[in-house]
From Swiss-Prot:
Disruption phenotype: Lethality between 2 weeks of birth, due to pancytopenia. Peripheral blood shows a decrease in red and white cells, hemoglobin, hematocrit and platelets. Yolk sacs from 11.5 dpc and fetal livers from 14.5 dpc display markedly reduced numbers of definitive multilineage and lineage-committed hematopoietic progenitors. Mice lacking the N-terminus (DeltaN-ZFP36L2) display female infertility, with embryos that cannot progress beyond the 2-cell stage of development. Show evidence of axonal and fiber degeneration. GO terms for cellular component: cytoplasm; cytosol; nucleus; ribonucleoprotein complex. Residues 449-468 have a biased composition (Low complexity). Its main location: nucleus. Induction: Up-regulated in response to fibroblast growth factor FGF4 in embryonic stem cells (ESCs) in a p38 MAPK-dependent manner (at protein level). Up-regulated by glucocorticoid agonists, such as dexamethasone (DEX), in burst-forming unit-erythroid (BFU-E) progenitors in a receptor NR3C1-dependent manner. Down-regulated during erythroid cell differentiation. Down-regulated during the conversion from quiescence to activated satellite cells upon muscle injury. This is mRNA decay activator protein ZFP36L2. The keyword Metal-binding applies. The keyword Magnesium does not apply. Pfam families: Tis11B_N, zf-CCCH.
Length: 484
């Protein structure tokens, strides 16, 4: 046999071996992949392209194991070649029809070998054999048997068993997940802020769906010390009212009381006066103390003689003193700083409030007297000069000087000149004014000064229609006791 005939045979044999090795490589790649329906690349020289193969298809597996050679690969290229030249392609050299028939009817031996090779790469389409099922069942039984000794839950034995506490017996026995007695009770690792804040649901509607398992405070005995860096518990305590604080039994600071115990309707509210007058000087600077009450309360509870000076005193006072005690400012204008200090002694309310029996929370203390004293010093000279000038004009208008009456409020008020009542009105309208120099005889006669100031006050236009001229006001009755 010549070398020209051997070289084609050698090429054909090499090509067939290469195709077999490629087919085996593709089969291993397909078995390693887990996804069903993965496309498998066939041999580039083979005419059979399976496409998307099902992994549980035995015929496809056998087709990959025995690929179909191309018709030209096994046919003799040279006419001089013997018929045995095609037999060098292996068992498929018998013809394409025989190989194609093997795709549909695989032999039992080759199919069993392929399934055995693939047993370690089981897919969902293959049913599990008996050995694997028994192994899984054995593992499940071991897990169930060891559940009594293993603690799977973090709350194991952290709560008492309710049936055991009630009846003394438990049907689960030693396998019970709850503690049968305090000796089995374990401490559970809690959050650092556990039981440090109030339960909003429980303290709002009175019911909590979590019950004793709630992580927030329901009762006072459940409270735990708050962590060092957290101040949320104190903020939550302030968020609730006095009813919740009394229910929990916590010590709570008293709420600051307002200055104005008189409501806008003029009636006293139900606040009680604490002993000692004002609670603190800081209350004078609170926003609520700067709101003056309506003028209706001044007309109902204050005297007509002091109402002309009440608006000026309330406007120039920094704390906005209530107008129900405007007689104190009038006394400061009449008697100077000494009279104001006597009237504004601690625990001495005004006569109108004391006669009505109201528990007024606004009690005059040293702080208020110190605030009103500069007002009395500023307005004392001007009021004295105005009263003296009015009294001189009154005596000049009459035929003879009338003696001052024994009781100044009971004296009838004579008609006054036009300028007699303009000065007090200017005093009531402008809170800031300049005091003119006082005449030397303005403080010579105290009774005449008192009568003149009272007469000017009665003609200032603020006299109430129900005032009896023959009846003395309560504030002047108390002040005249020392004179008599």
């Amino acid at each position: 046999m010549s070398t020209t005939l051997l070289s084609p045979f050698y090429d054909i044999d090499f090509l067939c071996k290469t195709e077999k090795s490629l087919a085996n490589l593709n089969l291993n790649n397909m078995l390693d992949k887990k996804a069903v329906g993965t496309p498998v690349a066939a041999a580039p020289s083979s005419s059979f392209t399976p496409g998307f193969l099902r992994r549980h298809s035995a015929s496809n597996l056998h087709a990959l194991a025995h690929p179909v050679p191309s018709p030209g690969s096994c046919s003799p290229k040279f006419p001089g070649a013997p018929n045995g030249g095609g037999s060098s392609c292996g068992p498929a050299g018998g013809g394409g029809l025989a190989s194609y028939g093997q795709l549909k009817e695989p032999s039992g031996g080759s199919g069993t070998a392929l399934v055995t090779k693939e047993s370690k790469f089981r897919d969902r389409s293959f049913s599990e054999n008996g050995e694997r099922s028994q192994h899984l069942l054995h593992l499940q039984q071991q897990q169930k048997g060891g559940s009594g000794s293993q603690i799977n839950s973090t709350r194991y034995k952290t709560e008492l068993c309710r049936p055991f506490e009630e009846s003394g017996t438990c049907k689960y026995g030693e396998k019970c997940q709850f503690a049968h007695g305090f000796h089995e009770l374990r401490s559970l690792t809690r959050h650092p802020k556990y039981k440090t804040e109030l339960c909003r649901t429980f303290h709002t509607i009175g019911f909590c769906p979590y019950g004793p398992r709630c992580h927030f405070i329901h009762n006072a005995d459940e409270r735990r010390p708050a962590p060092s860096g957290g101040g949320g518990a104190s903020g939550d305590l302030r968020a609730f009212g006095a009813r919740d604080a009394l229910h929990l039994g916590f010590a709570r600071e008293p709420r600051p009381k307002l200055h104005h115990s008189l409501s806008f309707s003029g009636f006293p509210s139900g606040h009680h006066q604490p002993p000692g007058g004002l609670e603190s000087p800081l209350l004078l600077d609170s926003p609520t103390s700067r709101t003056p009450p309506p003028p209706s309360s001044s007309a109902s509870s204050c005297s007509s003689s002091a109402s002309s000076c009440s608006s000026a005193s309330a406007a120039s006072t920094p704390s906005g003193a209530p107008t129900c005690c405007a007689t104190a400012a009038a006394a400061a204008l009449l008697y100077g700083p000494g009279g104001a200090e006597d009237l504004l002694s601690p625990g001495a309310p005004c006569a109108s409030c004391s006669s009505s029996g109201a528990n007024n929370a606004f009690a005059f203390g040293p702080e208020l007297s110190s605030l009103i004293t500069p007002l009395a010093i500023q307005t004392h000279n001007f009021a004295a000069a105005a009263a003296a000038a009015y009294y001189r004009n009154q005596q000049q208008g009459l035929t003879g000087p009338a003696p001052p009456p024994a009781q100044p409020p009971a004296a009838p008020a004579p008609p006054s000149p036009p300028f007699g009542f303009q000065l007090p009105r200017r005093l009531s309208e402008s809170p800031v004014f300049d005091a003119p120099p006082s005449p030397p005889d303005s403080l010579s006669d105290r009774d005449s000064y008192l009568s003149g100031s009272l007469s000017s006050g009665s003609l200032s236009g603020s006299e109430s229609p129900s005032l009896d001229p023959g009846r003395r006001l309560p504030i002047f009755s108390r002040l005249s006791i020392s004179d008599d």
